[in-house]
Curated annotation (Swiss-Prot):
Induction: Is part of the operon cntOLMI that is negatively regulated by zinc level through the Zur repressor, which leads to transcriptional activation of this operon under zinc depletion.
Domain of life: Bacteria
Its membrane topology: Multi-pass membrane protein
Entry GO CC: plasma membrane
Cell compartments where the protein resides: Cell inner membrane
Family annotation (InterPro entries): EamA_dom
The protein's role, per its UniProt record: Transports the metallophore pseudopaline, which is involved in the acquisition of nickel and zinc, and thus enables bacterial growth inside the host, where metal access is limited. Is probably involved in the export of pseudopaline.
EamA domain span: 8-138, 151-279
Transmembrane intervals: 2-22, 34-54, 74-94, 96-116, 122-142, 147-167, 179-199, 209-229, 236-256, 259-279
Keyword Membrane: yes
Family stated for the protein in its record: Belongs to the EamA transporter family.
Official protein name in the record: Pseudopaline exporter CntI
Alphabetical UniProt keywords: Cell inner membrane, Cell membrane, Membrane, Repeat, Transmembrane, Transmembrane helix, Transport
Amino acid sequence: MVLDLLKSGVLLAVLASFTFSVMNALVKEASATLPAAEIVFFRSAIGTLLIYLLMRQAGVALSRQGVPMLLVRGVMGALYLVCYFYAIAHIPLADASILAHMSPFFVILFSALFLGERIPRAVYWLLLVVVLGALMIVKPFSYSSYSVYAVVGLLSAVFAAGASVAIRQLSARHHTYEIVFYFLAVATLVAIPLMWSDFVVPATLREWGLLLAIGVVSLLGQVFLTRAFSHESATIVAVTRYIGIVFNAGWGWLFWSEVPDALTIAGGVLIVVACIALSRTKKG
């Protein structure tokens, strides 16, 4: 019965979203004493080791072709992690999650700019709705430090979209494990100079435990997500993943008493509805 359930793409997408929300909560807790770039380093280094072991077990070798695009995907993914973890450390989990889930908006823009894909006229209105929702969350007209952190969260969606476009170019020729390996290995290297001046030696078993848990849980989420895409259409998986916003909001309320304000809730609804519509439009 369990094996049958794990063949459900929708259930796997929900499990992936839940697992990543747990990772986000662990990141927020760790960020109380450790810099975001350092958390990215340990998350990526642990993940690199684990995915390498999976590659060995599956007999997946590193390619000699397509390396530049693999590196581009790695850099985009690394910058996504840095921005996302930084946002998680400074703004409510729900807010950071909503902003990161704007990546379909940027995927469409990048696909038009770099892949020459045509944007249907109806999509322009949906893009405007996404922008309006983002403005309601970032609140640029009531400038504060929150707005700066929210912009960083928005950048995480930009870099996630860049990584997604690169994956579309890579997935036909490269094994998923290899793509993930390059992502994590490059993220490890990118994090080193970013954390160099602010590095804090983890001083307690609790801090080491959090870092280890982040690395393991994040890779588990990646496995669930990869399997979800193999059992269900990309559109359905992408739409299902928006439940992650609910999970993140739940952790934020439960552990940090975070309650989104009315503008954030309204903006989040606009973004989710518009991005789901964008996903369905793109499929058609």
